[in-house]
């Protein structure tokens, strides 16, 4: 019987991209497989070893009554539960439904909406169960995932930085596209983790790692408004993969209310 | 040594001379719609015919009406990226049968010639020299790079709306700390040598003595920069002003605007804060201790096991400003600010430290 | 407070390797580790002054600043009393005797023991704050005749948090009067209840103007200790505290440990109170 920690990977409402990051960790995968017993990872193998598990990596948001029940079962089976990706940590892009009428969507998409059982909202795992660690990102960063796994194997807390994206832009020498080109960029209020990819490719950060700690989103939005960007441009920028996090939501709701008032 | 004249067409000869002496040339060049510092191969890489238009929170690259090589001021980069690299390995450790073998990384073999260093930047290098070289402990990473660099300074002939070097007594005239200093005229450069290495290089270039008219033209060009400076930071009594107003209401006011995003500290040519981290393979047998630029604006910067010391934007902005303008004087005998204005231009929400200091001079409501 | 002992030459990032020679459990979550240098030359050169600290390095985990708790005259083994608190100390706690780690140091300022000659000395320690004061106790005992009345006031949250209790009798016998107190009493506790500041309030001070007080513990305890001492007539220039901040370089190059104009790693950790007082209790400084 193996004494290696048992790892399981679970999926809820999501695109599978975060789980694929684990398979994408080619250089490290053999070491990971050597250090852990991968007991359940349907994306990689149909072999399923029943729980309990030492570590569960859980992707996806909770969107159905069945999800809400299943995540509680995953929690019961898992000693250390890691939420991976924006869906699991913030509700994901599908949390856009939280601002709309999901019944309307059902009627528009499905021939027999009465066959579909769904919740009115898409929410993070932490809204349903206790989560031991949240790994942010859409998708998660491979290096950070390896760090989390290495830390769990070593029995220490993972080291994932929680400063803003700007620090990484500056470290790599990227010119600020907000200041030099007037492009609205969420970098100053977004947690790093991606390595500041988007501004290096001439586009603003769209916040895929969610709000940085103590992010002052309201001040950034005010500055854009003063600089001529309208709420019609800013609301969709904030309501993205991490749009339903409290920091981004509060400001997008304020801007949306302003927009509604002017219409 | 008298002021000398270098024809613009001969600027490449200076570059060739330095390359021939084994220097890698780094200097201003256009990239990402800004003038940045990067490796350059020839005068063709310089931002000839370009200028910058700066304001709080705004930088725009614009074409000039002439063919000036150095017709702009300072951009988002500073020379610290070469002297105090954003990422550096401090130590490596390898597991052995009996424990660990630890080694310092090899010294760099490359040496850089910095082309186009402005007066405020010479001052910034001097400030960082004081921090990294002249204290009780010497930073070996900085020292290895600093000892080997050759500095070609350039006198500013214009100013940005964010410049305030005259308030800090750091410019715009390059006074010392360079090997060569250039002043750009329409068809030539006036060259001053500031060191023996500079004089040696001069001896190998086709220079002639500048005429009084050429010297006067250079003086006039430099005077344009002084005349162009509109921003002012009142430094009278600034140390006591800041350190005795630690509870001034303005700190909360600026905290409502500040994003705590660290951009000001990253573009600042004197900010020297860093953090050290461990990079390991999954087995943990090979370890590198790496130092990265860090910032007092990050929440974790003051984290201890007992909690975070500066746990709000107010305390972090206060730390930055009081350190830069006040406690730096206690620590290093000079201000940490050289008046380059980068922190004003590159603040995403246009916070201007000169306005914050002015507001701190007013009693709270 | 005196200038750093360490030379200005050399690479301050380089570590010596040391081996854990002995581990002595102290109180819950705290143990004293004795380290020996693997390089005998390094051992011969190594000296520290009471109050100074070392950076202990576990490759792959990181560094932690740990004060020395050794006898100042130690020549072969140097002890550090360490509480398990963060990643580094947790990993250290998993190493047994013989384990090898890195060490840089000693760094920082020291307690002004020479200024204490001819004077009465009060040490006020909260919890593990006694660790950096133990070298002072050893030094006072070793040169007992040079000092006046010597008192150690040691407080802890509970009786189980009192440090080095097995040595207290020796210290008392040697001429350092030890008084202990706890915030929360326990079934088998017959001693004082309250903070160390309460003990200080009660302590007879025959000549406050000729008394030196050294304190180490939580910031709030040191603050109230200093306040009480000033009220009792000790001059601010004869009060000394030991401050704590995030430290990464220990040599004034990384910026983390600033407290107002001070670098705690270099100007501290031991500060004369009148120097640090304007900044010490400013929230979030």
Where are these regions (language model features)?
Chain B
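A donor-sugar binding/catalytic signature common to diverse glycosyltransferases
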Residues: 263-279
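Extended amphipathic alpha-helical segments enriched in small hydrophobics
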Residues: 255-265
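Iron-sulfur-associated redox domains of electron-transfer enzymes in respiratory
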Residues: 1-243, 249-251, 271, 282
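Single, functionally critical "micro-switch" positions that shape active/binding sites
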Residues: 21, 261, 340
